[in-house]
């Protein structure tokens, strides 16, 4: 009897969890279409800004922080985009794993990485381990707004534009999850600064030489001058890239949460079925034992009467 009570209790608690998982899956399902569309709609603007930066870099060949890497400055900024909430499968753990791998590679190369973290789960992870974090942001990782992108880009731009002797960094990296589709989300490492010129037909093959740069984009006239245009466009470039990464990361988080909750719901239902079979088997065994005892008692009484 005690075994049956324990099974009933487990079935009830698992059924309660199954309802929670199913509700979370439905909520994520209702958000994913909007999150995906927002991420896709932000891409054309980001691409246009990047094309403008490419044009500036390709046709000026000037000495500007946007393209010049300070080889004497070992400090590097790394931004990790995690989530505020859990129940999203391996979403945050995958980001942290890739971030740790990047930090290790930078350390091995003689760099001094400075970590920036967006998302409560990542902030808690590094705070619990007493790791130094240069900047943190929390809130609305599944629906990031322009405000948080502005805040992050300002902090990173301030760090990038500072002189080396004042604690400035020479490179900016961002670790995020790119939304591919509902099933596939890829963790990526993007170097935002300095900018590397890439020709359209050479996407993914790395930077190109200055001799090929003039073929990358059409000719432009820059007013009032190239330096002022670069100074004006650089903050917009960083903010737009970060905002796009935040949006695609939000879509990835929502998709990951939906997939995780769908799997959890299926597992809960499977466990309920398994526990129900065990409960039925226990009941059947209990009934069989009671019948056996009754029949045995009746036989004993009959023999006694004889």
Predicted regions and their residues:
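C-terminal beta-strand-loop-alpha-helix "lid" module of Rossmann-like NAD(P)-dependent dehydrogenases
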Residues: 1-306
């Amino acid at each position: 009897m005690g075994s049956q009570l324990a099974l009933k209790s487990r079935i009830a608690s698992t059924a309660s969890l199954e309802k929670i998982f199913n509700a979370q899956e439905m909520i994520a399902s209702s958000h994913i279409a909007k999150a995906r569309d927002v991420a896709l709609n932000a891409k054309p603007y980001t691409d246009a800004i990047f094309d403008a930066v490419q044009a500036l870099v390709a046709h000026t060949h000037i000495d500007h922080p946007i393209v010049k890497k300070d080889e004497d400055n070992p400090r590097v900024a790394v931004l990790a985009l995690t989530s505020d909430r859990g129940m999203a499968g391996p979403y945050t753990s995958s980001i942290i794993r890739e971030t740790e791998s990047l930090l290790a590679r930078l350390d091995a190369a003689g760099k001094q990485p400075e970590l920036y973290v967006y998302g409560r789960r990542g902030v808690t992870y590094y705070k619990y381990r007493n790791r130094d974090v240069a900047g943190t942001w929390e809130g609305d990782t599944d629906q990031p707004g322009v405000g948080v992108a502005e805040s992050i880009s300002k902090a990173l731009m301030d760090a990038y534009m500072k002189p080396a002797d004042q604690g400035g960094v020479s490179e900016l990296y961002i670790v995020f999850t790119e939304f591919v589709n509902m099933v596939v989300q890829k963790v990526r490492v993007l170097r935002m600064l300095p900018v590397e010129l890439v020709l359209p037909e050479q996407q993914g093959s790395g930077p190109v030489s200055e001799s090929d740069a003039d073929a990358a984009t059409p000719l432009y006239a820059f007013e009032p001058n190239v330096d002022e245009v670069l100074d004006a466009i650089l903050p917009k470039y960083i903010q737009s890239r970060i905002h796009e990464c935040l949006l695609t990361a939000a879509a990835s988080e929502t998709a990951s949460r939906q997939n995780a909750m769908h799997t959890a719901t299926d597992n809960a239902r499977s466990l309920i079925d398994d526990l129900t079979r065990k409960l039925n088997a226990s009941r059947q065994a209990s009934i069989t034992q009671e019948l056996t005892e009754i029949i045995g008692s009746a036989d004993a009484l009959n023999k006694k009467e004889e």
